[in-house]
Amino acid sequence: MSSKEQKMPDEQVSEDMEVVSEQQNSADKAEASETESVVDPRVAELEEQLKQAQQRERDAILRAKAEVENIRRRTEQDVEKAHKFALERFANELLPVIDNLERALEVADRTNTEIAPMVEGIELTLKSFLGAVGKFGIEVVGDTNVPFNPEIHQAMTMMESDQHEPNHVMMVMQKGYTLNGRLLRPAMVAVSK
């Protein structure tokens, strides 16, 4: 036998194997396409569920970040308020001292030359004291001829007046004070009708 004749059956076998392999591949492809069409709705459903879960997670992360930012902002505001109004209790204790210095000046006999240095000392002390508390944000509320404001004034009486417009402060009986814009004590006033 020649070598040519021996190759023939081997070639035949390899060709047969290729044909069988191609048939198997096409059968696998057909089966895969059938499987894809069967699995496709389920895969689509799972992909949709995955997208929804990812969106929920993104939303949860955004909400958590926003909440952290809100907490940080509130904490900063609380700290700022604590710094700003830490003196409130102390300032309330100082108000009677200011009132007493003002009353001392009101009743002092300014015509008596013997007590003139004392009156001048009280005036300077009051001025210095008001300057010192003013540096810390304490301001006086007690102007006359201004519109009555219930947020900073406490009306003690209402009086008829031709010299003042209606609902204006005519007289201040006791001055009020604010600390950085927050009312410490309202001004006690007489209001025109």
Swiss-Prot record:
It comes from Photorhabdus laumondii subsp. laumondii (strain DSM 15139 / CIP 105565 / TT01). The gene is grpE. Residues 1-45 are annotated as: Disordered. This is Protein GrpE. It is found in: Cytoplasm. GO terms for cellular component: cytosol. Residues 1-10 have a biased composition (Basic and acidic residues). Signal peptide: none annotated. Pfam families: GrpE (PF01025). Belongs to the GrpE family. GO terms for molecular function: adenyl-nucleotide exchange factor activity; protein homodimerization activity; protein-folding chaperone binding; unfolded protein binding.
